[in-house]
């Protein structure tokens, strides 16, 4: 009985650790129209290099809008973008640092939003 309880406890602990996915964004700020900003997203709790990663945003009073995506190494790290940001925004990643980036150039007032990275 003691062995069985220990085994169940171990499984619960491992499942808890596995579910602790964290994505922490940084780098926002106030800039004038035409300016630039670079956002970062630090990932943990999963094998970052295996996953496609997306940026989405939510403008004040509006719903979520997809910004763009970078695929994983197996898919050549290819990227795609929403029409509204294509040519101005660039998504990159550094698998060695478990980090995702969003370089935003030629910013417009309509780019004002809360930006989120997503797996």
Curated annotation (Swiss-Prot):
UniProt keyword list: Adaptive immunity, Cell membrane, Disulfide bond, Immunity, Immunoglobulin, Immunoglobulin domain, Membrane, Secreted, Signal
Residue segments, region Complementarity-determining-1: 45-52
Record-linked InterPro entries: Ig-like_dom, Ig-like_dom_sf, Ig-like_fold, Ig_V-set, IgHV
GO molecular function, one term: antigen binding
Keyword Chloroplast listed: no
Taxonomic lineage from the root: Eukaryota, Metazoa, Chordata, Craniata, Vertebrata
UniProt region (Framework-3), positions on chain: 80-117
Gene Ontology CC terms, in alphabetical order: extracellular region; immunoglobulin complex; plasma membrane
Domain of life: Eukaryota
The keyword Cell membrane is assigned to this record: yes
Pfam families: V-set (PF07686)
Disulfide bonds: 41-117
GO BP terms in the entry: immunoglobulin mediated immune response
Major localization class: secreted
Function field: V region of the variable domain of immunoglobulin heavy chains that participates in the antigen recognition. Immunoglobulins, also known as antibodies, are membrane-bound or secreted glycoproteins produced by B lymphocytes. In the recognition phase of humoral immunity, the membrane-bound immunoglobulins serve as receptors which, upon binding of a specific antigen, trigger the clonal expansion and differentiation of B lymphocytes into immunoglobulins-secreting plasma cells.
Name recorded for this polypeptide: Immunoglobulin heavy variable 3-72
Localisation per UniProt entry: Secreted; Cell membrane
UniProt-annotated stretches for the region Complementarity-determining-2: 70-79
Organism of origin: Homo sapiens (Human)
Signal peptide: 1-19
Chain residue ranges for the region called Framework-2: 53-69
Complementarity-determining-3 as annotated region, ranges: 118-119
Domain Ig-like: 20-119
Assembly mode: Immunoglobulins are composed of two identical heavy chains and two identical light chains; disulfide-linked.
Residue segments, region Framework-1: 20-44
């Amino acid at each position: 009985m003691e062995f069985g309880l220990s085994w169940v406890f171990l499984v619960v602990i491992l499942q808890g650790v596995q579910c602790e996915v964290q994505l922490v964004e940084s780098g926002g700020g106030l800039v004038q129209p035409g300016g630039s900003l670079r956002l970062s997203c630090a990932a943990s709790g999963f094998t970052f290099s295996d996953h496609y990663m997306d940026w989405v945003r939510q403008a004040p009073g509006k719903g979520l809008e997809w910004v763009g995506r970078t695929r994983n190494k197996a898919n050549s790290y290819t990227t795609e973008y929403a029409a509204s940001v294509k040519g101005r925004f660039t998504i990159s990643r550094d698998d060695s640092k478990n980090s995702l980036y969003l370089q935003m150039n030629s910013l417009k007032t309509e780019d004002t939003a809360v930006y989120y990275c997503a797996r």
